[in-house]
Amino acid sequence: MLKNILLCSLQISLLGMSLGGNVLIWPMEGSHWLNVKIIIDELLRKEHNVTVLVASGALFITPSSISPSLTFEIYPVPFGKEKIESVIKDFVLTWLENRPSPSTIWTFYKEMAKVIEEFHLVSRGICDGVLKNEKLMSKLQKEKFEVLLSDPVFPCGDIVALKLGIPFIYSLRFSPASTVEKHCGKVPFPPSYVPAILSELTDQMSFTDRVRNFISYRMQDYMFETLWKQWDSYYTKALGRPTTLCETMGKAEIWLMRTYWDFEFPRPYLPNFEFVGGLHCKPAKPLPKEMEEFVQTSGEHGIVVFSLGSMVKNLTDEKANLIASALAQIPQKVLWRYKGKIPDTLGSNTRLFDWIPQNDLLGHPKTRAFITHGGTNGIYEAIYHGIPMVGVPMFADQPDNIAHMKAKGAAVEVNMNTMTSSDLLNALRTVINEPSYKENAMRLSRIHHDQPVKPLDRAVFWIEFVMRHKGAKHLRVAAHDLSWFQYHSLDVIGFLLACVASAILLVAKCCLFIFQKVGKTGKKKKRD
């Protein structure tokens, strides 16, 4: 009897394995990897087989053997971890030193172009590491993958998918001014009311704001055309036919966008764009004993959680002391993720940690506020738990993210470059003491939780959907098949203008003919 039960269990187990899909991952570094890793874990839980392509010089992606269904294919590239770390560091410093503003915009783009060129060199090394590795490509071909999940920030995932003859899905937070979503994904972005990403604008724009928004879109379009155009020849050579980066990216079956309407302003989107913002969020777990004891000493005042993310390791002594001085003046206890020199002005209410369980702290009932750099992952954890924020944005989408939270009444912003100790102190007192900030944060939290399907389940559903149906062509808009002048109906407008011009010309000719006839008749009568 026991033997039969064991055999039955084994058969069910094998059946589950056979029904599992075969997923290939083309990942991106940093926080992008953290989001994809959450999806991978859920795919593994649902008994899919997952293979992750990892460059030998990867910085954040650490191969692990958490499951026999998870495989890391490590391929050689002509650089080490130091190179990727250097590019990331240059990117952050360039943004910190030249944060886009009307007075610094051209300097910013000039300096950022250099960093992007360096990024392209690294990306090309990664592409070559896979596409020119015949042994690896042959092995991948034999694995019979059913779908590839890619982060479009790193090019070539789409090429790998097309080479293997499988559909691919994108996981994306944003591209500058949504150039990729707009030009490659064909999503409409009316500049009259849809703020360009990185513009720090909202959907409530004055005339001046709309001018600024329009210019922001055009400038980012220009940047995309000039800095990413070089990939067109690479894609053409790799695929063996004339094509472009954008045309190839447009073949993505589904775009998993890492935001949701608790964060975004209302705007048009397409049916193959799915929102999965906050897929990494989860209920808080108990804190480590020592940390919980410190939190409990806060009494009725509660705690403040402070983190500038993983990209900023430390601050200048002056800035650290300025911050510590402000934190020392609030009655709350503060848990600060910080690895630098201990500030001289550090108060007895503040404790420093190399690392903090951020999600668990934000979900703690004693948490009153979150001081954040404005990364999307951190903001979503605050939304999930209904915690008001003090934003200290520094680079990339962070200023834009905080602008969204300010517009929704859940955050106050301070400028890292110009803030004083009193600025930070006043911002903290505002979000802690004014009830509207907590109320708005809770409203966003309720919106986030009130979804028919959880973000992570939605992401996995669409990956499985594409595997089941070999794609999602029924969701692909016909705009992909049109040229740019057809898309904007310029041929139709030209035809109609020609018709109107022809009609006007015909009427004018008729009038002239009639006038001439009448004139001749009048002259003839006078002569008679």
Curated annotation (Swiss-Prot):
GO molecular function list: glucuronosyltransferase activity
Gene field: Ugt2a1
GO CC annotations on file: membrane
Enzyme's top EC category: transferase
Similarity field: Belongs to the UDP-glycosyltransferase family.
Membrane topology value: Single-pass type I membrane protein
Official protein name in the record: UDP-glucuronosyltransferase 2A1
Protein task: UDP-glucuronosyltransferase (UGT) that catalyzes phase II biotransformation reactions in which lipophilic substrates are conjugated with glucuronic acid to increase the metabolite's water solubility, thereby facilitating excretion into either the urine or bile. Essential for the elimination and detoxification of drugs, xenobiotics and endogenous compounds. Catalyzes the glucuronidation of endogenous steroid hormones such as androgens (testosterones) and estrogens (estradiol and estriol).
Source taxonomy: Eukaryota, Metazoa, Chordata, Craniata, Vertebrata
